[in-house]
């Protein structure tokens, strides 16, 4: 019984990570947008932006899920303007978020 319960809990813990899994093409698209726009703040931590590769900064955001991260990316937060100040479509914006998340997993 305990073994089944542990397996069920582990499965639930993996759901957010699995929902963010992407293919190489999406990650390349995300990296391109990151390098053209997001890098300014997410490479330095300017205005409290979570730095690329900083697992500790990204973990609470990842725990909230992709929908929450996309809401922030789309609408902006703090000094970050909506869509990171770009005209990126939802697919490209999501690819950039997924790229940044992939750098800490």
Features from the language model and the residues they span:
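Gly/Gly-Pro-rich "capping" loops immediately C-terminal to redox-active cysteine motifs
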Residues: 43-71
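Local sequence-structure signature of Cys/Sec-based thiol-disulfide redox active-site neighborhoods
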Residues: 28-36
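The canonical Cys-X-X-Cys-His
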Residues: 35-44, 96, 100
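ATP/adenylate-binding site constellation spanning eukaryotic-like Ser/Thr protein kinases
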Residues: 11, 35, 66
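N-terminal export/targeting leaders of redox proteins
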Residues: 1-28, 104-105
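Axial heme c-ligation environment in periplasmic c-type cytochrome domains
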Residues: 50-51, 69-103
